[in-house]
Amino acid sequence: LRKALYGLAQAPRRWHDHLVAVFEKHGLVRTVVDPCLFVLTVGTFVIKMGVHVDDFLFTTNSPTKFDAWFKRVTLDLKISSSGRIDLTGSDYMSLSITYDQAASFLKISQHDYIKKAIRMFGFEHLKSASTPMASGVKFTKADMPETVDERRRDLFRRMIGVARWVSRNTCFEATFAVSYLACFLENPSEPMLKAPVQIFRYFKWTIEAGVEGCY
């Protein structure tokens, strides 16, 4: 497992297989619709668990029974609990969650995470933009410089990493622009370095948006 985590391309798969083996031993069953969602049902007792790499989110209808179950799991897997999460106004993995049980309304956004990223990259002065990618932008590998500038590459990777996290969770319409620029992570040219800025301008435009719905 240690070699899989740090030395193999198939590390994510090995890690997930390890988690499946441990949690299935303790009654959790992986769902068909989502391999990262597990469910345990014993009579009226229910546990649902979502997995993101090494972060786990549990929901249950019986905290007392869950605590006893969780203690048994820790004998096979070294995990710790961060405590219970109040969904109203809480943040989980940079996701800001607004929950109105009476109205059956749920909204997930990343406005705080985006604001923090904008400050980190020094983009506070930039105007917002209505599109995540400027029209006519086109790069090829021929545009990549022969000499790699490590600092420039690091900045480009960090911008794309942040943008990818937002686009995958709450800003799906930016996915194409992020994926396109990610093709040039190894050696971005100066014009390429400017391209992700447009994505962050778009994030400023849609900062209060997110994923919302009633159920």
Regions found by a protein language model. Name each.
Residues L1-Y215:
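Long, low-complexity, charge-biased intrinsically disordered regions
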